[in-house]
Amino acid sequence: MEPPRGPPANGAEPSRAVGTVKVYLPNKQRTVVTVRDGMSVYDSLDKALKVRGLNQDCCVVYRLIKGRKTVTAWDTAIAPLDGEELIVEVLEDVPLTMHNFVRKTFFSLAFCDFCLKFLFHGFRCQTCGYKFHQHCSSKVPTVCVDMSTNRQQFYHSVQDLSGGSRQHEAPSNRPLNELLTPQGPSPRTQHCDPEHFPFPAPANAPLQRIRSTSTPNVHMVSTTAPMDSNLIQLTGQSFSTDAAGSRGGSDGTPRGSPSPASVSSGRKSPHSKSPAEQRERKSLADDKKKVKNLGYRDSGYYWEVPPSEVQLLKRIGTGSFGTVFRGRWHGDVAVKVLKVSQPTAEQAQAFKNEMQVLRKTRHVNILLFMGFMTRPGFAIITQWCEGSSLYHHLHVADTRFDMVQLIDVARQTAQGMDYLHAKNIIHRDLKSNNIFLHEGLTVKIGDFGLATVKTRWSGAQPLEQPSGSVLWMAAEVIRMQDPNPYSFQSDVYAYGVVLYELMTGSLPYSHIGCRDQIIFMVGRGYLSPDLSKISSNCPKAMRRLLSDCLKFQREERPLFPQILATIELLQRSLPKIERSASEPSLHRTQADELPACLLSAARLVP
């Protein structure tokens, strides 16, 4: 029996509310509707069903009388049912399944099924497998479809519902996402088009799914559309024609039997594919292969820059581990070509592993890492600093800084090193040449990390050797007695030498001209920077910090969190020059400027 599609023909105007009716809806939901004179059950439940993606054509309503369900027509007046309970259930022949969404973090490479963009945090349906971003939830089909199930079983249910006598047409060539995605309602009719109704689940699947309590409400009202029973008949046309002929095979031949009867019954042989189907299957297989290969691609691939895209303009300088050039790559950049001749496979892999760590560094006092190159040699691309190095300011240009500025440079350097150590990155070559003053007095630390380049290799095994400049080397690094002498404390020693440069304006051991003598005496503990050369206006707290950073035993040196806290406390304790609180006298009258005693004396004069 086809239920009516509209309100009763009496055309009576609804009047005031007289009561309520409790309604139990599908998917274990319930609501309360207001009873109004002149309205039918159809009208009263219309909104409650539409917001849940249902309509009266696919549901049946019961009255609950003494615990028993009694079928009630949709055109029944709602007024006599005041205070009663109604039950709305989905028709048994309507294969409706609700989504079961869960929040998921995709650690393997995944893409949204709708916007086709990278997906990390999102949602996934446990039944049909849809995965999507939260902002793509409006594109999710209203009805859940388990695409992994057998379509043949569903086709039988659709054909039974439509009478089984209709000749089905060829499947549509539209994409599956277009068929499964709800569209806006058509202006010509209040019922949706076939595109609004996705493929339902098979007949043996459960009709209702209980929504998880932890599932967010990603379906808004605008994402749902009412369903028409006629849509189920039209939906069967979008399935493959091999399922259409299986119903005609009534001879009882098994599905997998290769007998001629199975072929003559209208169902194609598994091996007889049309050229169009073969091309479509091949393209789908190629797409899956591309996605699979993309999923196993190393994330460092997106940070490796092709050499043809980088233009080297001018050589800036040469250091211990490479040559720095000014280049162009989407703007001005600094390119450091490292001194690695004929790198082995082990060196190349170690270099790429280190780039994975450096690409995650983001700090105001750290040079921005932008990419790397492995052909023809190892190279690192960083941001371009317009300013000069701290070494150039102190020892070449003789820039004069006041004590407040020097302490601020020391604080920013400690802040940047504290960030690197928090990332478990040891600089290994901290010195004034690698500290840049960018746009005024903003400190930028460069040339950090690079353990692969700063290590001597013997075949596939790295051999530890002293790396860096001699003046900034700690004693344990010079001796090389430990398997790995580089530590956070060795960076602290180098930072202590930088503090010495700031507070004295000169390099340590300037009176010794022999490099080997410096290496021997510092490694033995016979030589240390002369603290008597420190400026007389240097605060005592800075003197003590400088002395602690240059300790011979590395266990006695402080770490950068303690160093940073000490300098910040020192900065707060420095005297501040405050602006004068005096007011200008531009708008005062001459009488206001005179003292009151003079004015009173003037009045007493006869």
Swiss-Prot record:
Composition skew (Basic and acidic residues), residue ranges: 274-289
PTM annotation (Phosphoserine): residues: S157, S162, S186, S214, S257, S269
Keyword Metal-binding: yes
GO CC terms: cytoplasm; cytosol; mitochondrion
Enzyme Commission numbers on file: 2.7.11.1
Cofactor(s) it depends on: Zn(2+)
Keywords: ATP-binding, Kinase, Metal-binding, Nucleotide-binding, Phosphoprotein, Proto-oncogene, Serine/threonine-protein kinase, Transferase, Zinc, Zinc-finger
Entry binding sites for Zn(2+) 2: C112, C115, H133, C136
Positions of the RBD domain: 19-91
Binding-site positions, ATP: I316, G317, T318, G319, S320, F321, G322, T323, V324, K336
SMART domains (UniProt xref): C1, RBD, S_TKc
Tissue expression notes: Predominantly in urogenital tissues.
Top-level lineage group: Eukaryota
Homology family: Belongs to the protein kinase superfamily. TKL Ser/Thr protein kinase family. RAF subfamily.
Protein name: Serine/threonine-protein kinase A-Raf
High-level lineage: Eukaryota, Metazoa, Chordata, Craniata, Vertebrata
